[in-house]
Amino acid sequence: MDTFQVIILALIQGLTEFLPISSSAHLILPAQLLGWEDQGLSFDVAVNTGSLLAVVMYFRREILSMFTAWTGSVVSRKQTDESKLAWWIILATIPAVIIGFSAKDFIETHFRSIEVIAATTIIFGLLLWWADKMQRQGLNEFQVGWKKALVIGIAQAMALIPGTSRSGATITAALMLGLSREAAARFSFLMSVPVSLGAAILVTKDLLSSGQVIDYQALGLGILVSFIAAYICIHYFLKIISKMGMTPFVIYRLALGAVLCWIIFL
């Protein structure tokens, strides 16, 4: 890939990974409109690593606090709000791990098409709108509980279907379960850490076993661009939803779905 292609795709990944608008729906557009070839495993590793580093850096204090409390709870068996939150995030990760290992190839074979991405972009956009309009209890992330965490984890597993959006599915579920917009987003972002880390490890393993030639310059640029874009995106997303809710992202998803449908019927 040339430098321009690396920057554009890394920007798309970084800006869409944590917004409820589906990164896969956006990454398919350059391929369809510009005829770009698949970026390959090494680039996937790079942009996913950049996004992961961004969320870890942004929530570094919360993550350190949770990790410290969680390790303390394992030793002393005394639970704090932070240790409970850590346990709930671990629990919420399990469905995605199970379905990811058991159905990844099936999903990649049968659901990775522009038709599926267009449909899920629209359907889950409407679900996000409905969830955002529901009357909520205004719960924060420390009030999730194990049952709600498991339901949100199942929603995260559903996001393995391209076009769904991991953040979109988890935020939608969290809103339906009574969390405030900000708490739903924070819980979704924190949930992304173990899943993204696991995915990065698996893709790296596939990369090393594939014998693919690695362009380290493109990889480094992809990490840097996706990190900066994702960090900025997280910061402003939390500000936007506190003032405007999810409506801008719902409208955007519906418009994007319409564009994908237009491409399908061209």
UniProtKB/Swiss-Prot annotation:
InterPro entries hit by this protein: UppP
Keyword Ligase in record: no
Protein location: Cell inner membrane
Catalytic reaction equation(s): di-trans,octa-cis-undecaprenyl diphosphate + H2O = di-trans,octa-cis-undecaprenyl phosphate + phosphate + H(+)
GO BP: cell wall organization; peptidoglycan biosynthetic process; regulation of cell shape; response to antibiotic
TM helices/strands, residue ranges: 1-21, 39-59, 87-107, 111-131, 144-164, 183-203, 218-238, 246-266
Documented EC number(s): 3.6.1.27
Entry GO CC: plasma membrane
Keywords: Antibiotic resistance, Cell inner membrane, Cell membrane, Cell shape, Cell wall biogenesis/degradation, Hydrolase, Membrane, Peptidoglycan synthesis, Transmembrane, Transmembrane helix
Single GO molecular function: undecaprenyl-diphosphatase activity
Topology term for the membrane: Multi-pass membrane protein
Top enzyme category: hydrolase
Transmembrane found in the keyword field: yes
The protein's role, per its UniProt record: Catalyzes the dephosphorylation of undecaprenyl diphosphate (UPP). Confers resistance to bacitracin.
Family: Belongs to the UppP family.
Note: Bacitracin is thought to be involved in the inhibition of peptidoglycan synthesis by sequestering undecaprenyl diphosphate, thereby reducing the pool of lipid carrier available.
Classification via NCBIfam families: PRK00281.2-4, undec_PP_bacA
HAMAP family (alphabetical): Undec_diphosphatase (MF_01006)
Protein's recorded name: Undecaprenyl-diphosphatase
Gene that this sequence comes from: uppP
